[in-house]
Amino acid sequence: MLSTQVDTDKLNEFVGRFLGDLGATVHAGMVVIGERLGLYRALAEGPASATELAVRTGTDPRYVREWLSSQAAGGYVAYDPAADKFSLTPEQAFTLADENSPAYLPGAFQLALGSLKSVPRITEAFRSGAGMGWGEHDSDVFHGCERFFRPGYAANLVSSWIPALDGVQAKLAKGARVADVGCGRGASTLLMAQAFPNSQVVGFDYHAESIEAAREAARRSGVTNLRFEVAKAKEYEMGPYDFVTVFDCLHDMGDPVGAARHVRESMAPDGTWMIVEPFANDELKDNLNPVGRVYYAFSTLLCTPSSRSQEVGLCLGAQAGEARMREVVSSGGFTRFRRATETPFNLVYEARP
């Protein structure tokens, strides 16, 4: 009965899309393996056969051959059949082999694989309505999240996001008190401390494991004008702070209005709050695109369960949009709110008392 109602061309198109998704899903594991074994970095040194790449990396040639074949089929490496050698184009190397590149993406796959380990818990949460706290996820989520967002922060935070705010760059250069709330493993906090040595920067997060990793990163960097403390967004120590930041985490909070209110209370009268959120339009119909797809999926696995696990449990989700964020910030006591700048992956808001 159903077969008579199915358009064969549309069916084939959908099955083809499904096949692409299946390939992409298992390919995520290939990317993580390649990064952890240094296969991309070694291949960036020059074209190689499977055996040559195995020698460079101290790995098994047969496994490497199969891995390279999967990469070539996915368009992640180039293959020369005449020479039976593989290589990385400059664009592939920029994205896969250079961790300092603003386009470095393997961390996103680590985050994705870590998130998928929580599927059994999230499946049950659909039935029970329960939450799942950030700290309950696999450690690949914490590592991958930092490594997913860090390239974008490194490329934009100091060079374009802070300059887009009214008067903030000059304050930071002169010397200001800065609070980075929900700092995770401290990537954004460290960037600000390094860029503005006259300012005192403190990062807060309720996840103790991430704070310990942030402290270790600070020790390795040698930067002395920052510290990290374990604290919830509604309980971190009062300032007054000249500049408060939240990076890609306000929507994860159970009570973002309460967090906004605490930010307002902790700020100097002429302070600024910078809110960085995943790029989103206000309406679902305008988010039906590749970026929205990624964020809605992560929101189902990570963001919504995180918010639901906390008091209030507002569950804004990773695609809340500007209008919803304006409501939250205004309810927290701020009178001025604007979109300061944006990238394809982030929206940057400026709020003032």
Question: What is each model feature region?
Answer:
Residues 5, 9, 16-36, 41-42, ...:
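Conserved Class I S-adenosyl-L-methionine-dependent methyltransferase catalytic core
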Residues 47-55:
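Short acidic, hydrophobic short linear motifs in intrinsically disordered regions
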Residues 115-251, 256-258:
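Conserved adenosyl
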Residues 177, 271-272:
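Short glycine-centered segments of the SAM/dcSAM-binding site in methyltransferase folds
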Residues 257-269:
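A short glycine-rich, Lys/Arg-flanked "PGG" loop and its adjoining helix->strand segment in the class I
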Residues 276-331:
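C-terminal alpha-helical "lid/dimerization" subdomain adjacent to the S-adenosyl-L-methionine
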Residues 332-353:
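Core SAM-dependent methyltransferase catalytic element
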